[in-house]
Amino acid sequence: MGANSLPTDATLDLDEQISQLMQCKPLSEQQVRALCEKAKEILMDESNVQPVKSPVTICGDIHGQFHDLAELFRIGGKCPDTNYLFMGDYVDRGYYSVETVTLLVGLKVRYPQRITILRGNHESRQITQVYGFYDECLRKYGNANVWKIFTDLFDYFPLTALVESEIFCLHGGLSPSIETLDNIRNFDRVQEVPHEGPMCDLLWSDPDDRCGWGISPRGAGYTFGQDISEQFNHTNNLKLIARAHQLVMDGFNWAHEQKVVTIFSAPNYCYRCGNMASILEVDDCRNHTFIQFEPAPRRGEPDVTRRTPDYFL
C-alpha cells in the first residue's frame, strides 16, 4: 500500500499505533505479533542489496535511545515526508529498545517505500540476550514472546542497501569472501547472524588505518584497509561506503580518503559517552550534508548506566 492510498481500517489502526509509539508507549503483545507478520511479508520481498532512491537520509545506530530517535525525526523530518535509511542496531543498551524497534517496524509497514531498515549485529538472538533487549522485553511484557517475535523478524531485514547505484550502505563493513554486490545478492540471509563468514562480516567488520585485512578485536568480522575499500568501490562502480557500528565523537567520521564514512545516530551513547550524533542527507543531485544533533532532553532517567560496559560492540 502506497503512502497516498485511501485509508482503510488497517491503516487507521496503524496510524493510531504509530502515534501511540511516538509517545513512547509500547503496543500490546498481540499488536506486535500482527505488526511483525505484516512486516515479514514486506521484508521477504526486499533484496540483500536493497535499492534506494535519493533524496534519502541515512542514519546509524540508535540502540534503544527512543527520545533521541524522536529528536532525529524532528530534525530530519517526519516519515513519510523524508525518505529514511537506517543501518541497524535499533536495540540493546538504551532503555527503550521495545518502543524504538516497534516504531521503526510500524513505519516500515505503513510506508514501505519511504523507509529502509537494515540489519545490524545487534539484531540477533544471541547478542540481544546479553545486551538488554531480552531483559527489557521480559520486564515490559512479563514473558519473552515479544523478544522472540522481533528476533524472528530480524532474520528478514535486508543486509545492505544501494543508494542510486553509488552509495553502498551497511551496518559493519567488507568481507574477504565478497568481491561484488552480486555475491551478496546471492546468499540466503534468513537466519541468525552466523559467527563467521560473509554475512557475519557485513555486520561486524570495521575500516582501519592499516592496509589489507586484519583480525578484528571484536572477535567477529575483520578490519579492512583503504586498499580494500578502493578495490571494492572500483569493482562495483561505487562512490562511497556508508556504515555505522562504531561510536564516533562527532557523529560522523570519514576514512580511507573519503571512500568510507561512519555514521552514528545515538547521541551521548549509553547516556554517558558525551558524543554528538549525526544523520547524512543525500539530495536529488547526490550531494551530501551531515546534520549533527545532541541528546533530546530527558525526564526521569538515570544519568549513567548502572554498570559501565567492558567494551563496545
Swiss-Prot record:
Its cofactor is Mn(2+). Reversibly methyl esterified on Leu-313 by leucine carboxyl methyltransferase 1 (LCMT1) and pectin methylesterase 1 (PME1). Carboxyl methylation influences the affinity of the catalytic subunit for the different regulatory subunits, thereby modulating the PP2A holoenzyme's substrate specificity, enzyme activity and cellular localization. Phosphorylation of either threonine (by autophosphorylation-activated protein kinase) or tyrosine results in inactivation of the phosphatase. Auto-dephosphorylation has been suggested as a mechanism for reactivation. It catalyses: O-phospho-L-seryl-[protein] + H2O = L-seryl-[protein] + phosphate; O-phospho-L-threonyl-[protein] + H2O = L-threonyl-[protein] + phosphate. The keyword Phosphoprotein applies. GO terms for molecular function: metal ion binding; protein serine/threonine phosphatase activity. The modification Leucine methyl ester is found at residue 313. Pfam families: Metallophos. Its EC number is 3.1.3.16. Keywords: Cytoplasm, Hydrolase, Manganese, Metal-binding, Methylation, Phosphoprotein, Plant defense, Protein phosphatase. Its main location: cytoplasm. The keyword Transcription does not apply. Functions redundantly with PP2A3, and is involved in establishing auxin gradients, apical-basal axis of polarity and root and shoot apical meristem during embryogenesis. May dephosphorylate PIN1 and regulate its subcellular distribution for polar auxin transport. The holoenzyme composed of PP2AA1, PP2A4 and B'ZETA or B'ETA acts as a negative regulator of plant innate immunity by controlling BAK1 phosphorylation state and activation in surface-localized immune receptor complexes. This is Serine/threonine-protein phosphatase PP2A-4 catalytic subunit. It comes from Arabidopsis thaliana (Mouse-ear cress).
